[in-house]
Amino acid sequence: MAILNTLALLLLLVFLVCCLALAAFIGSLLYMVVLHHRLKEQGLRREEELLATPLPPDAELPHVVVQIPSFNEGPVLRRGIEAAARLDWPRDKLHIQVLDDSTDDTAVLARTVVAELREQGFDIVALQRTDRSGYKGGALHEAMQKTPYDYFAIFDVDYVPEPDFLRTCMRPFFANPDWAFV
């Protein structure tokens, strides 16, 4: 009988420890959920504040270089380049670099699209390397060395940004001039 009483007490003790552990787990989980929601709210408020930062007049906006790296991506090339040309930014401050390391006929298409947009008054160049060291990252780095401007937007060729992309993304830089990227 004493063994049964001891066993019953031991089981009761194990049960109570498990209940306490479960309560601690649930309490921790609730704390993390509440903390997550508070931080999310703070982040959303901060984002709203940053996006409400007014842009200066067009004449005072900085130059922005849009880089579009590509490698054998002919089917999406024209769409990506033309989307960059549709960005709502002063044309004299928008510089587009098509960084095409293609080994197929995409390079010809890139030069054709670039020539068409240059005729329309865009500052756009097609840069092609024979040495593909670093792949797309190498192309981006090499092209950055060829421009005096500080602001860059990098889009993969299959990405189609909304026309207001630059106006939206540049706002935080005016609220925080010491920021390096958004």
Name every feature range the model reports, one short phrase each.
Residues 1-58:
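N-terminal membrane-anchoring/stem segments of glycan-assembly enzymes
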